[in-house]
């Protein structure tokens, strides 16, 4: 039997505890799990991709079968093919996510029939977490420590100390 290889793609700006939970759970389902750090043309970034990659690696360092890969101008299915991925992993928080993700899964299946999409329901504790909401909290100086890995809290602190625009 061939290896089961997953790809969980996102912009992770910033990575949240909800992302980490999905990745941890997905890592148990696959022999190898790639976490694809993608550029989302529809989102305004808070952190540079290189900084996001560092934060992801720090948050996931104990997961031996997980590797973070960066992809700027690529489709997830193209990166999946490069890494012999068998399954795309997507997290679902609510019905709105399902509608969006079902549409994405349809197009991915049209582009790469050999790659299956699997959905993991977000744990109840993380159901309302989103990177965009975290960015809003950061903008207004709220405490984000309950929602993100400690490395993200530290990076936000550095940005604030350096008086960089948030």
UniProtKB/Swiss-Prot annotation:
Site keyed Transition state stabilizer: positions: 19
Leader sequence residues: none
Top EC class, one word: transferase
One GO CC term on file: cytoplasm
Keywords of this entry: ATP-binding, Coenzyme A biosynthesis, Cytoplasm, Magnesium, Nucleotide-binding, Nucleotidyltransferase, Transferase
Pathway membership: Cofactor biosynthesis; coenzyme A biosynthesis; CoA from (R)-pantothenate: step 4/5
EC number: 2.7.7.3
InterPro entries linked: Cyt_trans-like, PPAT, Rossmann-like_a/b/a_fold
Any one GO molecular function term: pantetheine-phosphate adenylyltransferase activity
The keyword Transferase is assigned to this record: yes
SUPFAM superfamilies: Nucleotidylyl transferase (SSF52374)
UniProt GO BP: coenzyme A biosynthetic process
Amino-acid positions noted as binding ATP in the UniProt annotation, renumbered to this chain: 11-12, 19, 91-93, 101, 126-132
Family: Belongs to the bacterial CoaD family.
PANTHER family linked to this entry: PHOSPHOPANTETHEINE ADENYLYLTRANSFERASE
Name this protein carries in UniProt: Phosphopantetheine adenylyltransferase
Species this protein is from: Streptococcus mutans serotype c (strain ATCC 700610 / UA159)
Gene name as annotated: coaD
């Amino acid at each position: 039997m061939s290896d089961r290889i997953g790809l969980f793609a996102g912009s992770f700006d910033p990575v949240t505890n909800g992302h980490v939970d999905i990745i941890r759970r997905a890592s148990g389902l696959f022999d190898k799990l790639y976490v694809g750090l993608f550029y989302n043309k529809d989102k305004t970034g808070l952190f540079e991709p290189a900084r996001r990659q560092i934060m992801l690696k720090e948050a996931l360092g104990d997961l031996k079968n997980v590797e973070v890969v960066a992809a700027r101008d690529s489709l997830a299915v193209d990166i999946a093919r490069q890494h012999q991925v068998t399954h795309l992993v997507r997290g679902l928080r609510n019905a709105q996510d399902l509608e969006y993700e079902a549409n994405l899964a349809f197009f991915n299946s049209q582009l790469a029939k050999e790659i299956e999409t699997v959905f993991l329901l977000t744990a109840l504790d993380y159901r309302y977490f989103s990177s965009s909401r975290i960015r809003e909290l950061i903008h207004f100086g709220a405490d984000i420590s309950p929602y993100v890995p400690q490395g993200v809290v530290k990076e936000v602190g550095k940005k604030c100390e350096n008086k960089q625009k948030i």
